[in-house]
Amino acid sequence: MLYRKLAKNMCAACCLCFLHLNTTLAQDRYSLPAADTLRLELRQAEKVFLDSNLQLLAQRYNIQSSQALVEQARKWENPMLNTDQNLYSGGHFFQHSVDANGNPQGEVYAQVTQLIKTAGKRGKQTDLARTNVSLAEWQFRSVMRNLRAQLFKDFYTIAQLQGNADMFGENMQRLLKLKGAQEQELNAGNIARKEYLRVQALIISLQHDMTDNAKSMNDAQSELKTILRITGNVFIKPMVPETESTELPSVTIMQLIDSARQNNTDYQQQVYQLQYNTQNLRLQKALAVPDITLGTEFDQAANYAPNYFGLAISLPLPLWDHNQGNIKSAHYQVKQQEAVRNDAGVKLQNDVLNAYQKLLYTARLSSDDNGRFYSDYYQLQKNIVESYNNRQISLIEFLDFFNDYQAVKQKELEQVLNLRLAKEDVNDIVGIDIIK
């Protein structure tokens, strides 16, 4: 009898060890090694972005390439050398001598010519190249602003998701503590099993919320690490204040619009594209004027006289082709771009107004009164589990308050995120950091 009892206990111990081993292996299978935490303030992240982002590096090379074309546009065409001489005569190759009278024998002809561009074509081509540099610079600023906006969005989103994760973790600890107390009450017969199961269901629901939050966190982390050119198992933890100031600078809509006209990258690209097309029209008109080729030539045995030196001038006669088609095409390109530029100006004004109004709405929602409400609500929540354990509130009241608290906390974190993103939307459209 003693032997059977001992064997039974040993079997149970082995089963427990096996289950523990399987649980450990399962956890190892579905978990990654602990990530290294990189704590960054926003300005630190922005500096890393400016120093290491590969898309910005590619755009910088594009600017340098355009600057090189300005230098090339200034260059004169190389002079042209044209030569002719006799190859074979009287049984001799390259015979260059004089006869008995001292007259040269054999042909030697050489001509050097230089193309002279008229109507200021070289200057107009240089102006086009300079405008192209300005376009490349604004394209660089556009890429930088777009990536910077994505950086800010990911950075602040991670901060919000981290706040959710902290809140979920605190709630899970409270629920697990409550679950442990309920197990004792259930075993003692003091509560119904349905109350215990309701708390378990709440724990499972919270686990799903934590999983969804972690997935969103991974997506934002991946985008942010790509922008910052960070690889490996690194977790970026944004260092941001818990609250966001609702104070806004005293600026008018017209001041914002005027600033946007000077700094908005999309609008400025259309402005410089119009300048480029206008300069191209001037160049096409200049191309209708013929260029002149000047040169000097020497002929050792010319028909006119030995050792002939002459002046050569050549130019095309513009009888039929006056570059009419290209001029007309360039003219309509200017008209087209004027319409595009004007449309971009209308869109810019509406975008500035829309972004600023959204900021005002969001800041109004983040008022001090709401802040006091959140503070009072969270203070009440700290005592809710204890109140339920002491039977001061029912299970239904506890569940309702618990779900409401979680929703309210998420709304507060979302509101802070919305205020930060609304500020950055205004800054992004205006083109400078006018809202701090």
What are these regions (language model features)?
Residues 11-22:
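Bacterial N-terminal signal peptides
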Residues 2-8, 25-35, 413-436:
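Acidic, low-complexity, intrinsically disordered peripheral segments
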Residues 2-3, 8-9, 40, 143-259, ...:
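Periplasmic alpha-helical coiled-coil/stalk elements that build and connect Gram-negative outer-membrane
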Residues 47-57, 64-79, 110-127, 138-145, ...:
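A glycine-/polar-enriched beta->alpha junction
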Residues 58-73, 143, 147-168, 177, ...:
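Amphipathic alpha-helical coiled-coil segments
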Residues 127-130, 193-202, 395-403:
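Short, charged, amphipathic alpha-helical segments
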Residues 28-38, 71, 82-118, 125, ...:
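Small/polar, glycine/serine/threonine/aspartate-rich low-complexity segments that form flexible
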Residues 26-80, 85, 232-275, 345, ...:
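Bacterial Sec-pathway N-terminal export signals of envelope proteins
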